């Protein structure tokens, strides 16, 4: 279970595609991508839960591909386990609702429980499944994903947060303050108030990173380019552009703005030295089955 209430928006340019092939026998320890070996156990556990639910013994070969960096603080595990939960259950002959899939995916990644829903969803602390807050067309938001480094991060999100919870004096205050921020975010989304949403989002992100910086030893995800992009966002806001930053457990910056300002924001943060590239995303749909084989996607 996650330790605090969480809000979430699904975006259309951060997509994971998963493909499953049933095979009579397979070595469940086989790893196609050694850089993701730490996820293998969770993948097997999810497949085992699906097999038990469908009363199957069949093994599966899994291919999962993101169109955004993996293990870099961009919610690749959330997207990945959401996609796998849907693909695995359909391959097993199960037709589960999004709510039931959310319950299944949550055991692998709390954030995956929210990623199944398009638009805006929430996962209250301790809940088994996420709930939809608003559809994607409720609020004309855009997220400018600003990539500040290449490659995976040195410390995984789960490892970093467990260490922070165990050693940081700022962890408990952050968690205690989360319900207030959660209500601010929820009301802001329902009322279409980007100012209120952005302020709460920035506050939450900074509290999280402050707690990690105070861990012993410190968990440091923010890089010089990260800080420079944050400064650029504040500059844009001082000039009247509604732009607000957030960072997950990683160095990349996600800039929240309105759709009409997204191109200008992307151009501005893209000029910051060290920025690799930017991706403009809008609200995305529910997780869905596709005929496109992820192995054919570049």
Enumerate the predicted regions with their spans.
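ATP-binding N-lobe of GHMP and related small-molecule kinases
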Residues: 1-72, 86-98, 267-268, 279-298
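Short beta-strand scaffold segments in enzyme catalytic cores
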Residues: 1-2, 17, 112-115, 119-122, ...
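Short alpha-helical "patches" and their helix-cap loops
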Residues: 13-14, 98-104, 158-166
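Short alpha-helix boundary/capping segments
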Residues: 35-38, 75-76, 170-173
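Short, well-ordered alpha-helical segments
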Residues: 41-44, 82, 227, 263
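Gly/Ser-rich oxyanion-binding loop with an adjacent helix/lid
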Residues: 56-140
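C-terminal nucleotide
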Residues: 135-298
């Amino acid at each position: 279970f996650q330790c605090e209430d969480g809000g979430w928006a699904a975006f259309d340019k951060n997509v994971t595609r998963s493909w499953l092939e049933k095979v009579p026998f397979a070595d469940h320890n086989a790893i196609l991508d050694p850089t993701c070996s730490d996820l293998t156990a969770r993948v097997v556990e999810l497949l085992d839960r699906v097999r038990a639910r469908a009363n199957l013994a069949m093994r599966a070969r899994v291919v999962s591909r993101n169109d955004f960096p993996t293990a870099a603080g961009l919610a690749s595990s959330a997207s990945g386990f959401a996609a796998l939960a849907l693909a695995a259950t359909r391959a097993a002959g199960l037709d589960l609702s999004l709510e039931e899939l959310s319950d299944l995916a949550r055991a692998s990644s709390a954030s995956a429980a929210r990623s199944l829903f398009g638009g805006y969803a929430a996962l209250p602390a301790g809940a088994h499944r996420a709930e939809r807050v608003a559809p994607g067309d409720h609020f004309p938001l855009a997220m400018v994903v600003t990539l500040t480094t290449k490659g995976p991060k040195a410390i995984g999100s789960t490892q970093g947060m467990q260490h922070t919870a165990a050693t940081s004096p700022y962890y408990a205050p952050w968690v205690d303050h989360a319900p207030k921020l959660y209500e601010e975010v929820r009301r802001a989304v329902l009322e279409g108030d980007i100012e209120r949403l952005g302020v709460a989002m920035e506050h939450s992100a900074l509290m999280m990173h402050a707690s990690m910086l105070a861990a012993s030893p410190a968990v440091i995800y923010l890089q010089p380019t990260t800080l420079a992009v944050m400064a650029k966002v504040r500059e844009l806001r001082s000039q009247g552009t509604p732009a607000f930053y957030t960072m997950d457990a990683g160095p990349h910056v996600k800039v929240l703005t309105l759709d009409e300002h997204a191109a200008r924001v992307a151009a501005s943060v893209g000029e910051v030295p060290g920025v690799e590239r930017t991706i403009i995303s809008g609200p995305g749909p529910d997780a869905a089955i596709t005929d496109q084989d992820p192995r054919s996607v570049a």
